[in-house]
């Protein structure tokens, strides 16, 4: 299915002059998302953490990470959680300071913030940015389906994958190595936290987009 089917869904746009962010990404607002999970199967495995960073644009057309939303999430009823996944992420479900919320609470708050950013940037819909973005989008869509949420601001299948973009820009597809190549500080001890990975992915995405602009690409944002 072509994403043209979704072009008329005006989630956050309004009349008046077109905002440069909307012009840059064809009406879509990039929002970086990372999830930490109980496994690889979005239908059966728990969503344990989710973070989302909205992207802003300055008066010169350069993009930057704007605001991050982060939640530790209670596993949905009947969710599968692989021991290997917990070992990999370091998540301790019984930690007294974990303070997890329901999937509904997490997504409702994130979607509210995303809609606010859509309105501020004159964009019609959010497009997920992620490192290996199909994984994050799959878990997001699965949670939306479980909750029967009717107003999901994200495009259901299009995304920007920073693993692909970093492979093009830096010859690296691993997040830590791509960040190092882009002169972005990356602490491996903090990795696999949804907040940390989201914010580093946002820095990487903005760096690649801005580097392309500096090299002469996308100078005319009204095209």
From Swiss-Prot:
Pfam families per UniProt: RNase_T (PF00929)
The keyword NAD belongs to this UniProt entry's keyword annotation: no
Keyword Zinc applies: no
Needed cofactors: Mg(2+)
Every Exonuclease domain range: 31-205
GO cellular component assignments: cytosol
Cofactor binding note from Swiss-Prot or TrEMBL: Binds two Mg(2+) per subunit. The active form of the enzyme binds two Mg(2+) ions in its active site. The first Mg(2+) forms only one salt bridge with the protein.
SMART domains, A to Z: EXOIII
Known EC number: 3.1.13.-
InterPro entries per record: Exonuclease_RNaseT/DNA_pol3, RNase_T, RNaseH-like_sf, RNaseH_sf
Active site: residue positions: 192
Comp. bias regions, Acidic residues: 1-11
Region annotation Disordered: where it falls in the sequence: 1-21
Protein function: Trims short 3' overhangs of a variety of RNA species, leaving a one or two nucleotide 3' overhang. Responsible for the end-turnover of tRNA: specifically removes the terminal AMP residue from uncharged tRNA (tRNA-C-C-A). Also appears to be involved in tRNA biosynthesis.
Assembly, per entry: Homodimer.
UniProt family annotation: Belongs to the RNase T family.
Protein name: Ribonuclease T
Species annotation: Pseudomonas fluorescens (strain ATCC BAA-477 / NRRL B-23932 / Pf-5)
